[in-house]
Amino acid sequence: MGFLKFSPFLVVSILLLYQACGLQAVPLRSTLESSPGMATLSEEEARLLAALVQNYMQMKVRELEQEEEQEAEGSSLDSPRSKRCGNLSTCMLGTYTQDLNKFHTFPQTSIGVGAPGKKRDMAKDLETNHHPYFGN
């Protein structure tokens, strides 16, 4: 009775093992020799590949030229500044002053120690209730 339960499993496993043994990881040498060379390209494919490579190289050259132009424009913009700032400390001081000014002009957020909140509002209410004569 137990043999009948395992017989389909046995048949399937034997078939799988037979198929696994039949498959080979490396193809036969005759199939490699009979197939046309995969590495060889036709004349049209070679021309297309050469055109693609040439277009890619031209695109990269244009990108590099644009980057060089942008760098040249950037250095020309900085040249009056370099003429004005003969001393490095003067330039750095000016830069830090500008950054500090930008920092102070940012809008204030309601986060942090001095932020308005429930506790501060309650404290103000207590002060106004304890000293009613200061309010008016």
From Swiss-Prot:
Region (Disordered): 64-84, 114-136
Bridged cysteine pairs (disulfide): C85-C91
Keyword Ribonucleoprotein: no
Annotated signal peptide: 1-25
Pfam family, one: Calc_CGRP_IAPP
Record-linked InterPro entries: Calcitonin, Calcitonin-like, Calcitonin/adrenomedullin, Calcitonin_CS, Calcitonin_peptide-like
Glycosylation sites: N87
Any one GO molecular function term: signaling receptor binding
Annotated localization: Secreted
SMART domains for the chain: CALCITONIN
Propeptide feature ranges: 26-82, 121-136
UniProt KW Glycoprotein keyword: yes
Keywords per UniProt: Amidation, Cleavage on pair of basic residues, Disulfide bond, Glycoprotein, Hormone, Phosphoprotein, Secreted, Signal
Modification Phosphoserine occurs at: S42
Family: Belongs to the calcitonin family.
Physiological role: Calcitonin is a peptide hormone that causes a rapid but short-lived drop in the level of calcium and phosphate in blood by promoting the incorporation of those ions in the bones. Calcitonin function is mediated by the calcitonin receptor/CALCR and the CALCR-RAMP2 (AMYR2) receptor complex.
Official protein name in the record: Calcitonin
Organism listed in the record: Rattus norvegicus
Taxonomic lineage: Eukaryota, Metazoa, Chordata, Craniata, Vertebrata
Gene: Calca
